[in-house]
Amino acid sequence: MEFEENLKGRADKNFSKMGKKSKKEKKEKKPAVGVFGMFRYADWLDKLCMILGTLAAIIHGTLLPLLMLVFGNMTDSFTKAEASILPSITNQSGPNSTLIISNSSLEEEMAIYAYYYTGIGAGVLIVAYIQVSLWCLAAGRQIHKIRQKFFHAIMNQEIGWFDVHDVGELNTRLTDDVSKINDGIGDKIGMFFQSITTFLAGFIIGFISGWKLTLVILAVSPLIGLSSALWAKVLTSFTNKELQAYAKAGAVAEEVLAAIRTVIAFGGQQKELERYNKNLEEAKNVGIKKAITASISIGIAYLLVYASYALAFWYGTSLVLSNEYSIGEVLTVFFSILLGTFSIGHLAPNIEAFANARGAAFEIFKIIDNEPSIDSFSTKGYKPDSIMGNLEFKNVHFNYPSRSEVQILKGLNLKVKSGQTVALVGNSGCGKSTTVQLMQRLYDPLEGVVSIDGQDIRTINVRYLREIIGVVSQEPVLFATTIAENIRYGREDVTMDEIEKAVKEANAYDFIMKLPHQFDTLVGERGAQLSGGQKQRIAIARALVRNPKILLLDEATSALDTESEAVVQAALDKAREGRTTIVIAHRLSTVRNADVIAGFDGGVIVEQGNHDELMREKGIYFKLVMTQTRGNEIEPGNNAYGSQSDTDASELTSEESKSPLIRRSIYRSVHRKQDQERRLSMKEAVDEDVPLVSFWRILNLNLSEWPYLLVGVLCAVINGCIQPVFAIVFSRIVGVFSRDDDHETKRQNCNLFSLFFLVMGLISFVTYFFQGFTFGKAGEILTKRVRYMVFKSMLRQDISWFDDHKNSTGSLTTRLASDASSVKGAMGARLAVVTQNVANLGTGVILSLVYGWQLTLLLVVIIPLIVLGGIIEMKLLSGQALKDKKQLEISGKIATEAIENFRTIVSLTREQKFETMYAQSLQVPYRNAMKKAHVFGITFSFTQAMMYFSYAACFRFGAYLVAQQLMTFENVMLVFSAVVFGAMAAGNTSSFAPDYAKAKVSASHIIRIIEKTPEIDSYSTEGLKPTLLEGNVKFNGVQFNYPTRPNIPVLQGLSLEVKKGQTLALVGSSGCGKSTVVQLLERFYDPMAGSVFLDGKEIKQLNVQWLRAHLGIVSQEPILFDCSIAENIAYGDNSRAVSHEEIVRAAKEANIHQFIDSLPDKYNTRVGDKGTQLSGGQKQRIAIARALVRQPHILLLDEATSALDTESEKVVQEALDKAREGRTCIVIAHRLSTIQNADLIVVIENGKVKEHGTHQQLLAQKGIYFSMVQAGAKRS
């Protein structure tokens, strides 16, 4: 359905299969969860809390209408007393015994009524606490379960589901949408029942006290209910659209932040901002429409309410004058109905919150309810006692779910005997990796059977199957924990001795032991702090500790240097003994000893045999071997020593912040455990120390909408003043009946006052509409602006900011999703209500001082107590909000890591481990929610009960003032009405305290990010922009340490020079500083000492954007964006519109055009999240095309051909050789054959240049370079 299609991220078009499915589903799905469905995760205790909370809310809702009974009787007492007092005052000049008796009896009667008020207040104190705290407790418990269930559901989905769903949205749903559910099913439900009960009790009391008048007023009530119901329905629809748009924006943000180095290197910040802004604009427009709809509904409701007042008093007057009712009975009926209808008005924010929650829950519950066809948590399925390891693929056909038109396997037949090693060879994208994925049952074949020991793997228990398989993939993923913990992901019960044994076998022991903290070293997000070779060896160790029956090696040694590869290959050869092994390798020298080599072509196996047999057949394998042999004159099929092995202090990392653009120094992962704890505590200290911003600072963010805010404030002030004006009119009507006027005068006065009510209704319609519309629009613009500004500021930061663990993708996307909506919580509609309530209270107090200052002074003492309750509540909740925010960021980080690395988690069968980690991270917010429930309950009940106590004091003292002839009852009523409505408004305002508390915390974080200016400012317009760039690069005495590891030197006085048009090759052992050279040239960091020059100008003097625009980079494991192939290639140059002809030309140069042209959607084919729909070789060639379309002056190649098969590599290498012509080029490569023609080869060791010269010169020196070449020759 379109609802789903809107959630698919970047591209507007989707795969045709999904499109067809969408239309079909549109009719089947509803956009909101059912009312009772919202509480599907409530257990008996939650239900008990909700039942008791509802009972308390019902009692609470009944107490206020009961108060009106007391009030009616009290009014009759007053009017009778005043009627007897006035003639006495008129007729006597001196003291009168009748007057004294009347006065004393009035005071006695009022004392009794005061006790009633106090008793009702005490009841409210208890039930209001129970109502709020129990509903908050129940909500906190359910949200805790929903978060866990949702995360479990995500972990339980099959890989095919992730292929057709935008994973970027899932984190937004885990934060923003779940918090919307929390808002909707907590205390607001209690308030809803309270309001409904007040409505019902009000009408019941109205009927009992005076059914005639009640029926007349009721004539208007259905219209009020109808407008509310219609509004709620429209609101749900708008809310869904708004959530979809924000989820899409969240997906964009996550994708961009996860690939931040790629975005920065290609200057894509503005393009990404525009893409993000497009989704925000959509959400804003929906929000404004929602505000307009809501405003019209509220305006109509108030118009109808005031019209009913006019009708009530007009008809009530007739009933009093005909002696059917007393004035007290009229007021009892009127106020009971008034409270009932007003309580319907109070339903609005509660209905809105619940409607929002229902909309948010729809997608979440849909994912929870989705039953995967491959269920990794299922206990069903066969679990054989022993596995021999005989594998068979029989007539297997397969298409990926996201590209159903593209056939990958077209009838694959393959047998692997127990203990055999079978090598799969063939061109990139022919189906080799797909075979490995089907073996793990990440997907099921469309036709045919995959079997183990003759058993169809679909009948075997999924978890059992995956646990007997060890996988090492081409792009290994490590998790943000220690090296030891990463290896333990292979098998949970593994001992430290077994870990050490595995890392020795994987040739990782030496580099680990050289680290200050050895196995306790943190590897960073996605292993970003290690070089590719180090990551690969840890991944191999992780596979070996599983002691698997079946070993799947997909380019397992591609990231290793020559020396490491030889040792690791030997370890893998040893590990293969007694195991069934499937190997995929582009370097054919690593598979020549395989028992069977299977040649793939077009999704089927076209030849099988051992190396010698296939060489004699002279088919596909022979052709690949010959191509590779010709290409590798120095070291056939091998890497050069020197990119990624041991303690890499600077290597161009394959997975940097999940953006494999630049290899980061291993030393930046050198955390002691206590160091980690220290930094975490520092993080907390930093968060705590952020000063909470003032309301005016938050308002300043909305200042450009001042015309809207001004109109909104004026309308809110008018709406606030209408209540005290109502008090004047109301007191005058009561006053009419306490005077001894004739009937006709009374009728005329009452008719006039009734007309005033109608005028007030018309004014309210206009002012409530403009109040809602202007504040609503300003609030939506604010939300959009804040999200945009924060995202823009994030993209502005330098790389060192992203290096900080607290700025992980998960944390940043969580902040983006939740902070902006929290700030809106202090603005928009809530600000309107607060302004209105302040105006209400302020005007009420001023009027009261004019008409009865003595009584007002008493009330002015009481009101601060109500306000104090609100302030205490806000302070306490602010502290809780800060703790919640920090802890939910940690949860968000875990969730993001799990979602983004889902394939690895599934292969390792570690879904439950991540669930446990996620559940543990939710404990602090859960405990805080439990505490918060009681805090909110106590403060809410206090502010509510204080109103009743203030009534008791008001009327007791009022009776005394009337008895002493210091005030008339008319004025007592005026002061009472003005202050009652003002106090109710103050109490209502305090209920916004939790939202305002959250808003202040969020605003503080937002402003800190927005105001942060980085040292290397990507947005800066300063700096030189030479008209001509030749491409002379010079490093002069450069010293550099990474900002997060200031005590570990990386470059120690490096000096080198490359002239324009020259190719410079950097070689050396891992950790020597090769990659740091490239990072400093990209100006991701600045050197601590020494200088980097470009054409004789220090690069610090050059404009950053201009500098990067002239550099083109191709990395070992490139990141692609979830958009079309054409858009990915065009991303190479974001400064202009790249024509389709240029895209095609670049694709042809990168040897990818033919493949693209064979796809149904050709260049419009989406590549999936991070390019997952493509093979490694296809991704690499698209990345090369992306760099070539840029036409850079300086080309930076980090293992640019490492992921390619032999045939592709040869053609691409030729393309790169051609691309290098006339350009300065810096190359880092394992295969020395690819750099032997370089103009200058520089050997770096320990951050300094040790050797430099041409290939022949360095061979003649017989130094380090010569040793590398010899090592390569032995491997050939």
UniProtKB/Swiss-Prot annotation:
GO terms for molecular function: ABC-type xenobiotic transporter activity; ATP binding; ATP hydrolysis activity; floppase activity; phosphatidylcholine floppase activity. Residues 640-652 have a biased composition (Polar residues). Keywords: ATP-binding, Cell membrane, Cytoplasm, Glycoprotein, Lipid transport, Membrane, Nucleotide-binding, Phosphoprotein, Repeat, Translocase, Transmembrane, Transmembrane helix, Transport. Several phosphorylated serine residues are present in the linker domain. ATP 1 binds at residues 426-433. It is a multi-pass membrane protein. Residues 50-356, 709-998 form the ABC transmembrane type-1 domain. Pfam families: ABC_membrane (PF00664), ABC_tran (PF00005). The keyword Kinase does not apply. Residues 1-43, 137-185, 236-293, 352-709, 776-830, 873-932, 994-1276 are cytoplasmic. The chain crosses the membrane at residues 44-66, 116-136, 186-207, 215-235, 294-315, 330-351, 710-730, 755-775, 831-851, 853-872, 933-955, 972-993. Its EC number is 7.6.2.2, 7.6.2.1. The modification Phosphoserine is found at residue 659. In mouse the MDR gene family includes three or more related but distinct cellular genes. Interacts with PSMB5. Belongs to the ABC transporter superfamily. ABCB family. Multidrug resistance exporter (TC 3.A.1.201) subfamily. This is ATP-dependent translocase ABCB1. The gene is Abcb1b.
